[in-house]
């Protein structure tokens, strides 16, 4: 929605729009990043088995042959920035005009999803729930470890204690994950612009300053550990420089070219974790590598 009021050398304008992109989407089979988390499970189990064999905990790798997985995953999300912009334009000369204004931004994000029932063909057998398998395995190993400790058989206690710890670790990594969270926040963007028009040429320049934003989590469900309720996360809108040039070739034909540059490196953004390695990645990872 756009409106303008013009009087003499002044023009006062306002608009309301969804700015900076945004939208909503539903992924009934989850996101690719969800799949990447689960796809490493077979290899992780085989590697864990090899490690326990090397340490003398297991005589053979009972997880060899694990090469299949499945998962029930789902994601629905939205990211919207609603902007109310007000500004004034003044005609300095017959050829040059200047604009100054501000935009009030309101961020409305929402995420709902899950990763459930991770299964694998452990040891090349039938597909089973990995979390349940290793939870039961950990309980059995812990019971055996406690019994050996009571009998003062420290060698077997150490072996079954190691099995219980490793099984508990795998069970935790493959537990169901659920998220239901909204995020809201607001910030103000100062805007400056110049417009030059002479004969058949028209040149426009606009600069939008960096918008400092924090979004606050309103979390209903989260066992991912990533969206704690009440936490504020950096969500800046980067500064933007745009330049446009047009030339009137004919009264009914114009040629134009434009350039825009987002100053991403100066904007505060939340860090993320690599879904495979678990390492924290700063914003520069995404800016430089995508």
Kindly label every feature range from the protein language model.
Residues 6-290:
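Outer-membrane beta-barrel porins/channels
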Residues 1-2:
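Active-site-flanking structural segment that lines cofactor/substrate pockets
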